[in-house]
Amino acid sequence: MGASILLILALQAVGPAAQLPTEVVLRVSGAVSQPLALSLQDLAAMPRTKVTAKEHDTTVTYEGVPLTNILQKAGAPLGKQLHGKALASYVLVTAHDGYRVVFALPELDPDFTDASRQIILADTANGKPLPEKQGPVRIVVPQEKKGARWIRMVESIEVVKLP
């Protein structure tokens, strides 16, 4: 009987297989048709990609969702919708500490840029969740020479149309 109780307690301590948190880690808003509130679980269910890049003299393989996929899911004007006044749209990415970076919407759209340019919202580095000081999600821009737009602890993405 004692062994049975120990087994039950051990199984309860281990619990079911680890699941990703369902709390919202990212909000997408602004000039989109479908504002989003995404959890790590939501992001894990989206099409993913890996990019390998140098950061502080270290080569890191990041995995996450292409930023364009998130913008498409939110209904941002991309592809054939990105013309005329919509070309003056930009994406404002904000971190937990208030740090912000801007991307012109056309520079993110594969119809306007080299398809090999993959800007991703990463949630893992070298197969592990991002450290607390970087995550839970961050933007990775592997082709840029400076890391100023590699924004950590991303909380929101806003699509803004200039008047």
Predicted regions and their residues:
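Bacterial N-terminal signal peptides
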Residues: 2-12
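N-terminal intrinsically disordered, low-complexity segments enriched in P/E/S/T
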Residues: 14-163
